[in-house]
Curated annotation (Swiss-Prot):
It comes from Nitratidesulfovibrio vulgaris (strain DSM 19637 / Miyazaki F) (Desulfovibrio vulgaris). One of its GO terms (molecular function) is rRNA binding. It holds the Pfam family Ribosomal_L21p. This is Large ribosomal subunit protein bL21. GO terms for cellular component: cytoplasm; ribonucleoprotein complex; ribosome. The gene is rplU. It comes from the Bacteria. PANTHER family: 50S RIBOSOMAL PROTEIN L21, LARGE RIBOSOMAL SUBUNIT PROTEIN BL21M. InterPro entries: bL21-like, bL21-like_sf, Ribosomal_bL21. Disulfide bonds: none annotated.
Length: 102
């Protein structure tokens, strides 16, 4: 069974036991969170929400918090000998999916 969930403005296809990296959540490492924004359930029983499936929830464990790889933003203005280099690292939360309940 799989589910499509929404968290942090993005959608993820998850199965039990999967590890996903989502936008940073306010939760302690090792704690459990419940995601009730389930857009679709698939597998044996197929159901699509409008916008969310009622009564469906996904339970996940917070594995760790971290920062992604550095992205380089480089801007250059021609004929001015002007340029700007800036780096960015996005915070993330790693989740391990424990259970999908329909």
């Amino acid at each position: 069974m799989y589910a499509i969930i929404e968290t942090g403005g993005k959608q993820f296809r998850v199965e039990e036991g999967a590890k996903i990296f989502v936008e940073k959540l306010v939760a302690e490492a090792g704690s459990e969170i419940v995601i009730d924004k389930v857009l679709m359930l698939g597998g044996g029983a197929f159901s699509v929400g409008a916008p969310y499936v009622e009564g469906a929830k996904v339970t996940a464990e917070v594995v760790e918090h971290g920062r992604g790889e550095k992205l380089i933003v480089f801007k250059k203005w021609r004929r001015n000998d002007s340029r700007k280099k800036q780096g960015h690292r996005q915070d993330f939360t790693a989740l391990k999916i424990k259970a999908i309940q329909a």
